[in-house]
Amino acid sequence: MDAALRDICQLSDPCDPRSFEPPIKDFFCIYPMYRSRYEAKAIQGSNEFLDGWNKAIEKDGLRNDGRPFLGCNTIYGNYVAWAYPECLPERAAHVAAYCDWGFFWDDATDAMSMEKNHEATKDLILTIMSTVGIGQKHEPLLAVNKLVVPFVLNKLAGTDGDLGLNHMKAWKAHLDGQARSSHANMSWEELKQHRLVEGGPEWAIRLGAWGAGIRCTAEEIESVREIIDIGGIAGVLANDYYSFNKEFDEHSRAGTIERMQNGVALLMREYGYSEEEAREILKKEINKMEQQFMDMYLTWLNGPVQKSRGLIQYLTMVLCLYSGTMFWMAHGARYHRTDLITTAEDRATIIGKCQGDAFRVMEGYPPPKGLKRTASSPESAPKRRASKANNINQSNGRGGDPMVAFSGPFVKAPSHICDAPYEYIDSLQSKNMRDKFINILNSWLNVPSDSLQIIKNIVQMLHNSSLMLDDIEDASPLRRGQPATHIFYGASQTINSANFSYVKTVIEATHLKNPQCLQIFLEEVSDLHRGQSLDLHWRHHGRCPTTDEYIMMVDNKTGGLFRLMARLMEAESPSPITTPHLSRLLTLIGRYYQIRDDYMNLTSADYTTKKGYCEDLDEGKFSLPLIHLLLHTSCPDRITSALYNRVPSTGLQDEVKTYILDAMQSARTFEYVREVLSHLHGEIMKTLDEAEKTLGINNGVRMLLVGLGL
């Protein structure tokens, strides 16, 4: 490995992390490490940024306890020199300042109440997305958020601006992950995947690519995603290991212990381990994944598959990032503060504060030494449930009379069997965009909380029910990366459960205060079914719709839920506001969501993971890309023959899908769809501007809609 690294690392030199004095007490990383020759530039960048930060934090009043903010600079040098050793000399100071801003911002917001944290995050995301995403200046409310604007405008969006934009997208995803994070009742395996998203390694990787000027295609990066993610999980768990004491202290001061996002805390809370035991488990897990990363890196590097110089630089940069970050965390004052007010005894109070009735069991490790109650085996509970479910009750009637059952009174059947398919799809991980949209619309409409919850219930049940039916109608095997509901429960039971959920939504609608709500509900649900009927009709008969017909279908099918939520909210609002701009805004949003979904289904690796490879083609769905292709290819009959002259319920061969994708490239279909999305996004933002003139400024709506364009 040394020879390979020396060939790639031209601006740095090998460095033995165990040669520093005084020696680091708790360092267990097994990665090789490199150190930049331009460390002085990074140190200077950090020093200059700290002055500006302290002034901003004082202006915002975010910390008044006198404790210093600690970041890149340490007794041994600067974080950037070890984590980004190949950073270009002219960018080292900028990267150091930006890293410090991220570290300090994280500390400042951790100490906030949940409400203030959400407001600060919203302010930051809107600033970043407006500045980089659509080129509109948004004046941040917080001085600490204003500090990032010059860097974003002059650096990330300047030279290598596309690399900078990639970084900002990753940073937004990191913030989104933290905003919806909750480790309550989560298993160890679930935590690892969750921390990979919320822990932010991707934004740090993209920053490294900008700092070093490394260029790779999205396809190249996806080809090494598995390697990156293994090391990424090890990295975020190492962060949890070294930052546990500090995080606990900050959350304790803020009264937000339940929001603590940390692997040590989870092992103590959900598995019953002591802090010492939890730390030992983390060490072993981290070293195991570090070794996996290095083995996979070397196998990939020496493998026969051709790879670009840029991709080799990219993955090597990731290795250096993981290595240098571990070294920095092991000794940096940011992670080893001496001004904590909480103790080991305080931290021990979270042991056993699990959500379930019993501790979880950590596979491959002995139970906690101090275990006082019986841990639940992951295998035992399902067996008990299965035994009860499969048992045949031989009792007929009462008192042994076999005829009593036939003449007895009506007994209502239990609902748990009917509910089970719905509960399954409701349990699958979702972005909850509809709930978010309802919440931010409510800044305008001020719907009472009880009515708002009913509307959320209606929209959630309708959405999930439609997904259950869609997956049957489309013969889709996957939903959100998991088996579709009908795979487990069968088509008949899934349809019955979806219909039962529709009945529940009607009941919910009758609980709303305004009698108009039931009529609104019936109108919009009728439109939803009309829109779906068009989609199914075209597919069944193999008839390609016009663009106008496609938009009509989308407005009724996808736009229906947006209109439903808004109309119900307007009806329940104590001060209803009627404006054509809001109605148009929701219509445009529905179109954008559907067309983007059409596009991503054919182009996104993430969609392939969650739904399957180009699943819309398997369905024979007349998406906007397919409509455009059939209108602009010289051989449309080849496409329609492959799509509609095949055995029902059989998918297309991958070779046929590849042919269709190549045909779309030749017809410039994807370029056309991107132009449509760009046009729609511009119209959405213009319509929002008009709506805000009547309804008032709504930064929540603006943040969500700006994010659509990234």
From Swiss-Prot:
Binding site for Mg(2+) 1: D106
Chain sites annotated for binding dimethylallyl diphosphate: R479, K557, T558, Q594, N601, K611, K621
An individual GO BP term: terpenoid biosynthetic process
MF GO annotations: lyase activity; metal ion binding; prenyltransferase activity
Positions bound to substrate: D106, N239, S243, F244, N245, K246, E247, R334, Y335
Domain of life: Eukaryota
Motif NSE/DTE mapped to chain: 239-247
Binding-site residues, isopentenyl diphosphate: K431, R434, H463, R480
Pathway it works in: Secondary metabolite biosynthesis; terpenoid biosynthesis
Region annotated Disordered, chain positions: 367-401
Binding-site positions, Mg(2+) 2: D106
Residues at which Mg(2+) 3 binds: D470, D474
Residue ranges annotated as motif DDXXD 2: 470-474
Annotated region (Terpene cyclase), positions in chain: 1-338
PANTHER family the UniProt entry points to: GERANYLGERANYL PYROPHOSPHATE SYNTHASE, THIJ_PFPI FAMILY PROTEIN (AFU_ORTHOLOGUE AFUA_3G01210)-RELATED
Subunit structure, as described in the record: Hexamer.
Record remark: domains: The conserved DDXXD motifs as well as the NSE/DTE motif are important for the catalytic activity, presumably through binding to Mg(2+).
The protein's name: Aspergildiene synthase
Organism: Aspergillus ustus
Gene name tied to this protein: AuAS
